Curated annotation (Swiss-Prot):
HAMAP family: Thymidylate_kinase
Catalytic activity, EC: 2.7.4.9
GO CC list: cytosol
Organism of this sequence: Streptococcus agalactiae serotype V (strain ATCC BAA-611 / 2603 V/R)
Classification lineage: Bacteria, Bacillati, Bacillota, Bacilli, Lactobacillales
UniProt gene name: tmk
Protein name: Thymidylate kinase
Function in brief: Phosphorylation of dTMP to form dTDP in both de novo and salvage pathways of dTTP synthesis.
Catalyzed reaction equations: dTMP + ATP = dTDP + ADP
Length: 211
C-alpha cells in the first residue's frame, strides 16, 4: 500500500484556492491510481460542519476572537480524527481546503492573538500532524476582496465582512509562514490567469508525489 499524503490548500479570502482544488481534482484522478479524498476546514464531518455554521454566521458579530480560535480548533480535531487520519492510514491522498496555517494567519496575524499559543493549540488539536505539502495561493488583498464582491456563487460569510486592513494582516501572516517553512509551503501567484494557476498547482503536486 502506498503511503498516504496530506496536501493543504491555503490562502486569503478571494485567492481562488477552492476553485483551483476543484479544478485540479479530476486531473489528478485521471493521472494517478491512488484514491483521492477532498475535504475542508472548518467542516468535513457533521460535528465540524455544525461548528462551521456557528463560526461563519454573519449574525455572530459579537464573537470573541479567542472563542473563534477555540471553535476552529474543536472543528479541526474532530475532522482530523474522524476523516483525515483514517484516509491517510488507507493510503489516500487527502486534499484539504485549509488546515493549521489558517489559524496562524487569521487568528494570529489577523486578530492579533499570540502565535505561540496558536501553534501550541494546533499541535494539541492535531497531535502535531502537519501537511506533507501546503500550497499557498497568494493574491493582493485588494484583488481578493474585489473577487469576493464580484462572485455571484460565493455565499458571503462573517470573515468576508472584515475591513481591508484585516485581510492585509492575514496575507502578511501567510507570507511569513511561507518564508519560515519553505520545504513544506509552496507559494503560487494566484493573480495569474486561472488556467495558469491550475497548471502550476497540478505540476507541483505531481512533483511532490513523485519524489
Amino acid at each position: 500500500m502506498k503511503k498516504g499524503l496530506m496536501i493543504s490548500f491555503e490562502g486569503p479570502d478571494g485567492a481562488g484556492k477552492t476553485t483551483v482544488l476543484e479544478a485540479v481534482l479530476p486531473l489528478l484522478r485521471e493521472k494517478l491510481s491512488q484514491d483521492i479524498l477532498t475535504t475542508r476546514e472548518p467542516g468535513g464531518v457533521t460535528i465540524s460542519e455544525e461548528i462551521r455554521h456557528i463560526i461563519l454566521d454573519v449574525k455572530h458579530t459579537q464573537m470573541d476572537k479567542k472563542t473563534e480560535l477555540l471553535l476552529y480548533m474543536a472543528a479541526r480535531r474532530q475532522h482530523l480524527v474522524e476523516k483525515v487520519l483514517p484516509a491517510l492510514e488507507e493510503g489516500k491522498i487527502v486534499l484539504m481546503d485549509r488546515f493549521i496555517d489558517s489559524s496562524v494567519a487569521y487568528q494570529g496575524s489577523g486578530r492579533g492573538l499570540d502565535k505561540s499559543h496558536i501553534k501550541w493549540l494546533n499541535d494539541y488539536a492535531t497531535d502535531s500532524h502537519k501537511p506533507d505539502l501546503t500550497l499557498y495561493f497568494d493574491v493582493p488583498s485588494e484583488v481578493g476582496l474585489e473577487r469576493i464582491q464580484k462572485s455571484v456563487q460565493r455565499e458571503v460569510n462573517r470573515l468576508d465582512l472584515e475591513q481591508l486592513d484585516m485581510h492585509q494582516r492575514v496575507r502578511q501572516g501567510y507570507l511569513e509562514l511561507a518564508d519560515s517553512e519553505p520545504n513544506r509551503i509552496v507559494t503560487i501567484d494566484a493573480s495569474q490567469q486561472l488556467d495558469e494557476v491550475i497548471a502550476e498547482t497540478f505540476s507541483i503536486i505531481l512533483d511532490r508525489i513523485n519524489q
